[in-house]
């Protein structure tokens, strides 16, 4: 208790001294002295009334920290300062680009944050002698325009190359259902007038004239088959002056092969060109054998057993007839005599057979030149006939014969 009493007494003496000093020097409050550092000295007066307190508790009031004061002063100064205008951030808007039926297509477009005030500030900072007026067109746009003009001039200077037209596919509106359209793919017909001229030129050939007069029943050369000849001329890709008589018969044979199921109608072309000879029999047998193999997948397997069957049959016949070996030696001679006899009766058989083989080879080459596109739609045939409907060829209709 003695320590606390002495502490309170000392504190009372200090406060008494401070109060007396304030009474003796009243003018110091009005004009406080400055310190040597240049900052004013602040006097702290404690007018607290002393009283008893709990033992062990500091009676001095808690003072505010220096950091809190500085924070408050900074906040006051920041409130006093005028608020600076912040630049508007770029915004995103949606604008209508196209109108599709009852639906709208929106395109995202960024709004430019540049205001007229920014242009004025920029013009005020320019040096004297500089045009402050804003440019109407950007430099990038000018460069792009100049590059476009140069590219157009270069394209005009270069010679245009004439390329052969290629078949294209377009979509045309077939029917309109409410707000929906049904599209149908249609191939563009690339038959040029020069192909019609080549066809008309070949019709003046005497052999082709005789062939058309020979086909009275129109089994090989009706108007649709002749229209397919013009289409094949356009697809083959040859110049019009290169088409000869053989190309006409190749295209006509290929048209009959695509449209007619009768094999005799195609053989009539060979009958007219090379005559009725027996040289086509091996070719027909070969075709018949190929057709049989395509219809029966086991034909190749069964064919491998043919030599064994012939051997067994020969062994059986030899066992039954001991003179079979003697007669067998005469078989090549008989075949040779028979071939010589047939050749004497028709000396043109060997020559005609080679010509037919050459015709088939040329037909295959002509088919490959068209890239295998031998099918022709009825619409294309109608367009071919509509080019010159008064032509005498289109009167060759089978319906008029019956």
UniProtKB/Swiss-Prot annotation:
Transmembrane segments: none annotated. It comes from the Eukaryota. InterPro entries: Speedy (IPR020984). GO terms for molecular function: protein kinase binding. Residues 76-90 have a biased composition (Acidic residues). Residues 1-90 are annotated as: Disordered. Residues 16-39 have a biased composition (Polar residues). Belongs to the Speedy/Ringo family. This is Speedy protein E21. It comes from Homo sapiens (Human). The gene is SPDYE21.
């Amino acid at each position: 208790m003695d320590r606390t009493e002495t502490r309170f007494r000392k504190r009372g003496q200090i406060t008494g001294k401070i109060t007396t000093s304030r009474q003796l020097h009243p003018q110091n409050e009005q004009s406080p002295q400055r310190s040597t550092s240049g900052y004013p000295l602040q006097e702290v007066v404690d007018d607290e009334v002393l009283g008893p307190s709990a033992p062990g508790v500091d009676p001095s009031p808690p003072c505010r920290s220096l950091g809190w004061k500085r924070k408050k002063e900074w906040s006051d100064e920041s409130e006093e300062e005028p608020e600076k205008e912040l630049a508007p951030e770029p915004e995103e808007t949606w604008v209508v680009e196209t109108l599709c039926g009852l639906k709208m297509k929106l395109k995202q477009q960024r709004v430019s944050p540049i205001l007229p005030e920014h242009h004025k500030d920029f013009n005020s900072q320019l040096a004297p002698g500089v045009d402050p007026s804003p440019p109407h067109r950007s430099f990038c746009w000018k460069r792009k325009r100049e590059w476009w003009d140069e590219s157009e001039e270069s394209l005009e200077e270069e010679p245009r190359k004439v390329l052969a037209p290629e078949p294209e596919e377009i979509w045309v509106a077939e029917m309109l259902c409410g707000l929906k359209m049904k599209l149908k793919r249609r191939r563009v017909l690339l038959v040029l007038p020069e192909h019609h001229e080549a066809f008309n030129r070949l019709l003046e050939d005497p052999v082709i004239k005789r062939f058309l007069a020979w086909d009275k029943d129109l089994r090989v050369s009706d108007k649709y088959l002749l229209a397919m000849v013009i289409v094949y001329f356009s697809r083959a890709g040859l110049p019009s002056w290169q088409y000869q008589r053989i190309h006409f018969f190749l295209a006509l044979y290929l048209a009959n092969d695509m449209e007619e199921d009768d094999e005799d109608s195609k053989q009539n072309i060979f009958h007219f060109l090379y005559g009725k000879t027996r040289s086509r029999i091996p070719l027909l047998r070969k075709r018949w054998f190929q057709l049989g193999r395509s219809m029966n997948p086991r034909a190749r397997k069964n064919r491998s057993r043919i030599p064994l069957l012939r051997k067994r049959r020969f062994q059986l016949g030899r066992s039954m007839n001991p003179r079979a070996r003697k007669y067998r030696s005469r078989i090549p001679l008989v075949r040779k005599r028979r071939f010589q006899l047939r050749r004497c009766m028709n000396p043109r058989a060997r020559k005609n057979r080679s010509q037919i083989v050459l015709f088939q080879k040329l037909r295959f080459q002509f088919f490959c030149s068209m890239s295998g596109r031998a099918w022709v739609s009825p619409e294309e045939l109608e367009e071919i006939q509509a080019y010159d409907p008064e032509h005498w060829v289109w009167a060759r209709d089978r319906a008029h014969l019956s």
